[in-house]
Amino acid sequence: MKSSLLLFAAILPLKGFAETADSTIAQHHTLEEVVVRGFKQDNLSKAPLSVSVAGSTFLQRNELNGLRDMSSVFPNLFIADYGARQNTPIYIRGIGSKTNAPSVGLYVDGMPYFERSVVDMDIAGISGIEVLRGPQGTLYGRNSTGGLINIYTYSPLDYQNTMAKISYGSRNDLRLGVNHYQKISSRVGINVAANYHHNDGFFRNLYTGAKADNLQSANAKVGLAWQATPLWTMRLSALFDHSTQGGYPYGHYHAVDNTADAVNYNRPGNYRRNLFTAGMNWLYKGNAVHFNSQTSVQLSKDKQQIDQDFTPRDLFFTITGLKQTLVSQEFTLRSAKDNSRYHWMVGAFGFYQRLNNTIETQFFTPNYATPKFYHTPTWGGAFYHQSAYDLTKTLRVAVGLRYDYERVAQDYEANKYTLTTGWSSLVRTATFNDHTHFSQITPKFTISQQLSTDKMVYASVARGYKAGGYNVTSTTTTLPAYDPEYNWNYEIGTKLGFLQGRLQTEMSLFYIDWKHQQVTTTVPGLGNIINNAGHSDSKGFELSATYRPLMGLELQANYGYTYARFLRYEKSATVHFTGNMLPMVPRQT
């Protein structure tokens, strides 16, 4: 385990933090009192769903710098930490995805992160994190069948400060960071940030003598906030992130005694990624309605080289590359009057994503290579609505409905050439061109009873949906595509406050019926193939307690339990996984 020593940290306040938490509201599953900043669900402490919230002070004190660090503090959230940043599977309540599009949504300041290779990075200036468990497809749609992670950063209109940080730890783990937030007028603020991270790595390659999993990353961010009128606010932000890593620190596994050999392969691997994300947000807060517009653009380019045989022998070597272009736009309109018995929200979302994949495997003994090219454009749109009605002063029912449409195409080309002669000997061996579309209606039903100002119970039923797509490693047209997957989430829960708000507890129980699950199968020498496994389920619960016996003293405990298994999965006529536990799903968190 890496230990770290903070050498220097300076916080130079220009003005105080303009936002303060409402201490009269019990923050359930809350790691500190923070202001809820989300537009779609602005009072999570009273929302009928299982949610965890962490604020900036907690994140800083616990040195939580990136997404992978969050597994240690949120119940029933697991983010695998293996290999390069290209692979960052996220699981909530056992629902997740290892290789294709994520099953847990990620939004940073309202901007979606749809591609799994871009979600793992160090994020500067985080003001709060929300983890919503269970399908959130009604309001968020794509890639949120397991849940959702919302990350918010400071606005220079609300927060003015300069922060500089240097930290050093074992494995030469060095972090440098500077963040500056400033108002340049009463209505305009700017922020700039720069961060750097270096780590020597943990595993040494016996063949090369060098560390196999070293890391260097750097990012820079600029932002602008403008309060155009008392009712209109605009935010602009742009982020550039660069990462360079070593290859996978893998060794041969021995199932008999459950041991693994040391890292020992002859061709050093590496992973490089450049990421650019920009967004513009317009927010209107009127007396009758609130309106939100979110525009975002994301460009990423990465390249990975890996000694795929993981041995000292020259068998085969794989080079992969991915270019992504993502453009999205969302409009949301909601009612603003809290004293009304009827609350509503409507919205529209559209996106275009283009993925260009390159996969080349070099076979040294046969002396040939097989470069393959995949062009996968996807576009989609959605309309959603949610209505909540107070049957009495304490009893509320809510219904949400979303329609999603998605069209995906793939243009595939396979080639082969001789390694000794190079690309001059290139010949085309296969082509494939196809397109398909998916559509779905995802509902959500909720009923909640407010027993008192700090006590409530609720029950909900929600449907999760994840569109299908095309494989990017299939060598033939027999298995190019995979179908959509679906789940139903059934949940009951309580949020209870005691001792005049000093003790806050939350409990939620869930059962997820997961059909046509998209499962990844590794084919030696080929890669990962996605197919629909059959039928799975996941069940469990979350418990949370926060106690504040004295001013400035807070005691917290969070616990999550998940039991997820295959109810039916016949991989082939002779291989059956029915009854097996789902991979990458810890029983207890």
Predicted regions and their residues:
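Short, acidic, small-residue-rich periplasmic hinge/interaction motif at the N-terminus
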Residues: 19-60
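N-terminal periplasmic accessory domains that precede
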Residues: 67-70, 89-94, 107, 128-131, ...
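Extracytoplasmic beta-strand/coil segments of soluble accessory domains associated
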Residues: 68-109
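Short acidic/polar hinge/loop motifs at secondary-structure boundaries
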Residues: 109-135
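Transmembrane beta-barrel wall of Gram-negative outer-membrane proteins
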Residues: 161-163, 168-199, 207-245, 274-276, ...
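Structural signature of Gram-negative outer-membrane beta-barrels, strongest in the C-terminal barrel
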Residues: 225-229, 239, 333-335, 343, ...
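Flexible loop and strand-edge segments within Gram-negative outer membrane beta-barrel domains
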Residues: 233-275, 302-304, 313-322, 352-377
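Gram-negative outer-membrane beta-barrel transporters
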Residues: 397, 511-513, 531-589
